[in-house]
């Protein structure tokens, strides 16, 4: 059975201006994938008659074209007219829809405006889809000749989603690919996108029928595998053999959730000592349900005096090396470990910017330390010259990733 080609068209000048995010495309793409369809292209056009050409172009490539938006009562809502133009048909007033519109407004005690009856105009040959949450009915024009099936949906997500679930999916289920592909996403930390691809790409592409894609995030890389269950099992096995040290567990979890799960499994408690991140590391840990079982204490020691009074960092070390230095961050981590009674402590001190940098310590410099009870303290320096928010997120990512190395030390027996 051939793969059904699906394209999405979203109308809305506000999307192109960046005033709103195109959540409809993301939701539809995911929902259609779950049902066995692959969206091949998404097109966004401004309100008005640009929709005509977009529909013509999609009609040349796709078997199903789904359009969202442009079904309202105003003059720039012209998706119905565009469908008539592309299909070469006229429109008629559907009296059933017109009566429904009247009752819709009457129930709300609002007089209906004449322009609202525009929404009762239906292209000849199209079927009407009921809208349970608004006034814009959806429309389905069956495939005919060289033209694909057109499905017209209202733009507001609160109207679009129920219509898709209740009307569109039952309509499409008989057309779906019988061999529905599966998706599995693995999140990795501690390795960059390019290095990861070099490490695993050749092996993964040897798996027949497996599609591989990479998505870089701040301090993380997602690997998306698409294919049959057999292909996914083979792909996952190869990924874990080659890059298992970087894969978060449980699969698909956020880094902070993975940290909490890891600490719980190891029966460890953690503490944090933060300067440049201002408590972000502690916040991310405590955002996870169950964090109370693994998180002991957190300090935000922004000033040098706080580092000395709260964490015991020696004044002479601060004066000699400066707050952003290996000796200071090491002392912060060890002080947090001692004062909290935790099993592992992470400390960070850096220059988030935009000011405060020097030739020796430019903006973006950060030192991190992880102190382990009964073990050696590990330190690391990073240079991440980005905006303040991205810098703080990246530092918190690296700090959390280091906590995944914490292990419960078994007592030594004679």
From Swiss-Prot:
Domain of life: Bacteria
Disulfide bonds: none
Signal peptide (from-to): none
Pfam families associated with the record: CinA, CinA_KH, MoCF_biosynth
NCBIfam families: cinA_nterm (TIGR00200), molyb_syn (TIGR00177), PncC_domain (TIGR00199), PRK00549.1 (NF001813)
Family membership noted in the UniProt record: Belongs to the CinA family.
Name the record gives this protein: CinA-like protein
Species per Swiss-Prot/TrEMBL record: Akkermansia muciniphila (strain ATCC BAA-835 / DSM 22959 / JCM 33894 / BCRC 81048 / CCUG 64013 / CIP 107961 / Muc)
Lineage: Bacteria, Pseudomonadati, Verrucomicrobiota, Verrucomicrobiia, Verrucomicrobiales
